[in-house]
């Protein structure tokens, strides 16, 4: 378990290092002095100085910073204009101003962030997210090169179903659904998960020929035994319904289902089948939790289930591709991750998914640790590939989140710089400072709430 957590923290740290290194290397390229390059927050554990930069590893491993000379974040506590005199400053603000002046006196201010052109500053701020996307691409190359990609090939067609009426056949490859591009099976799965009742205008290829058809899902109401869990494809429980048999029995989010009644489970479909065919008898789940296998016995409950059946099944098996194909589908992998993050944010704000879906650093480490544990049975290479897959997703996620126009994040700072480029003059520093300060406070509050949720989910 300790090793799993260490690996998870290591991966997150690498993602942060790459982000901050993006800022660092582009700042250096533009002649900007980097005062401090740090990994983590809090007290310094290890630090040394090389040239004009102090390099630090700090106590809390989540996060990092690339602090540049003349960067307004160097003196976040001073939200005063240059015209303010010392009598109007609080003791804390005076101390912050002294620190700022001490730093400025020790360096050449012509190498400060603020002294550079607006386009140089835009490049420096944008570099962090861009490097995250580059890291996601490198991880994707390793994954696709090793395992291939997962096209949306139709594997099974049910008799007398909407799929047969639409003329679909086994082996057809879906490339578009209702105007949404489908490169991977996951594209189709994600769309269907939140649009199950919609008629599907499908573009597909058969023997190299492009074709179109329309599938109207069949609305089915039936009685089924359920326990009240949501799973991903790898049998990892993403959520447990409140007051459900699963919650009462003790199943938890992030448990990984390994077996049901002693039978190993290969995917989420096999788990669902085991539950629905139980006939209401008690079902014993063997789940991986905190590095151990735990048995949890649940009594399924009969509920009326509404579903929309298309009549075809896609397994999403990966297939190998050429070196050129590897590069192509690696770019598509990054695009998929970016698109998924943006769509998930949209669904979060529209209420399609709940706040419980958010994960902070603790929740992310916990989930990564469980996935590492789940992968061990397949060998070290698959542990490595699963970590690479998570790194690609998290790195792309970090890139997108940092580009959002939120004060105190890279995206918020880019907004002010773009305004400066369009106006030909910067926004007043005191105004920008106030906005960034408020944004930072709100961001810290959100982080604390998510952190609290993550910690409570561990118990």
Regions found by a protein language model. Name each.
Residues 64, 90-159, 445:
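Internal alpha-helical transmembrane segments
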Residues 103-119, 224-248, 253-259, 263-264, ...:
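Functional transmembrane alpha-helices
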Residues 19, 57, 128, 163, ...:
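Terminal peptide-recognition signature
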Residues 71-78, 158-217:
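Juxtamembrane extramembrane loops of integral membrane proteins
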Residues 434-454:
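Final/C-terminal transmembrane alpha-helix of multipass membrane proteins
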